């Protein structure tokens, strides 16, 4: 019955896994979306999970810590994921190759084959931040032909680009 009502009234739920290297801005994004304000964060050991409702869609967002020692645990969160939000610190040119390797490791896992991919090109407010087209190239996204992906420029602290990213997820998710 719930599925019938959600079809009629347009309420959808989406399981989102938010990953990225440490200090990319994942937790800041999660709580900016949830609370509408910037919060002081500490490095996430483990995960945060929150439900964010936007445009009649309930996003169940799992924000998992990004330190290199925690990354092997990411795969334990893959099952049932419908959308991947991969957050990149656009000012961190030294680690963009590391980000690319991690992204491709995630999306090549069979548990993630059906997930659509949103890249938040975060920290666009910082000087010398890489622009979306540069992120697209450096992450090797143009070679991904069999998946639905999108790069959204963002600034977690101001909220710029965050809701546009959620809009893309709602428009491209097929339940």
From Swiss-Prot:
Entry GO terms, CC: cell cortex; cleavage furrow; cytoplasm; cytosol; early endosome membrane; endocytic vesicle; endosome; extracellular exosome
Any matching Pfam family: Arf
Compartments it resides in: Cytoplasm, Cytosol; Cell membrane; Endosome membrane; Recycling endosome membrane
Family matches, as InterPro entries: Arf6, P-loop_NTPase, Small_GTP-bd, Small_GTPase_ARF, Small_GTPase_ARF/SAR
GO molecular function: G protein activity; GDP binding; GTP binding; GTPase activity; signaling adaptor activity; thioesterase binding
GO biological process, one term: protein localization to cleavage furrow
Activity modulation notes: Activation is generally mediated by a guanine exchange factor (GEF), while inactivation through hydrolysis of bound GTP is catalyzed by a GTPase activating protein (GAP). Activated by ASAP3. Inactivated by ACAP1 and ACAP2. Activated by NGF via NTRK1. Activated by PRKAA2 through its C-terminal regulatory domain.
Enzyme Commission no: 3.6.5.2
Binding site for GTP: 23-28, 41-44, 63-67, 122-125, 155-156
Reaction equations catalysed: GTP + H2O = GDP + phosphate + H(+)
Result when mutating residue 27 to N: Constitutively inactivated. Fails to associate with membranes. Does not inhibit filopodia formation
Membrane-topology descriptor: Lipid-anchor
Lipid attachment in record (N-myristoyl glycine): 2
Top enzyme category: hydrolase
Lipid attachment site numbers (N6-myristoyl lysine): 3
Keywords: Cell cycle, Cell division, Cell membrane, Cell projection, Cytoplasm, Differentiation, Endosome, Golgi apparatus, GTP-binding, Hydrolase, Lipoprotein, Membrane, Myristate, Neurogenesis, Nucleotide-binding, Protein transport, Transport
Maturation and modification: GTP-bound form is myristoylated on Lys-3 by NMT1 and NMT2, allowing ARF6 to remain on membranes during the GTPase cycle, thereby promoting its activity. GDP-bound inactive form is demyristoylated on Lys-3 by SIRT2 at early endosomes or endocytic recycling compartment to allow its efficient activation by a guanine exchange factor (GEF) after GDP release.
Tissue specificity field: Ubiquitous, with higher levels in heart, substantia nigra, and kidney.
PANTHER family registered for this protein in UniProt: ADP RIBOSYLATION FACTOR-RELATED
Subunit structure: Interacts (when activated) with GGA1, GGA2 and GGA3; the interaction is required for proper subcellular location of GGA1, GGA2 and GGA3. Interacts with PIP5K1C. Interacts with USP6 (via Rab-GAP TBC domain). Interacts with RAB11FIP3 and RAB11FIP4. Interacts with HERC1. Interacts with ARHGAP21. Interacts with ASAP3; the interaction is stabilized by calcium ions. Interacts with NCS1/FREQ at the plasma membrane. Interacts with TBC1D24. Interacts with ECPAS. Interacts with MICALL1. Interacts with SPAG9 homodimers, forming heterotetramers. Interacts with CYTH3. Interacts with ASAP2.
Recorded family membership: Belongs to the small GTPase superfamily. Arf family.
NCBIfam families, per the entry: small_GTP (TIGR00231)
Protein name stated in the entry: ADP-ribosylation factor 6
Gene coding for it: ARF6
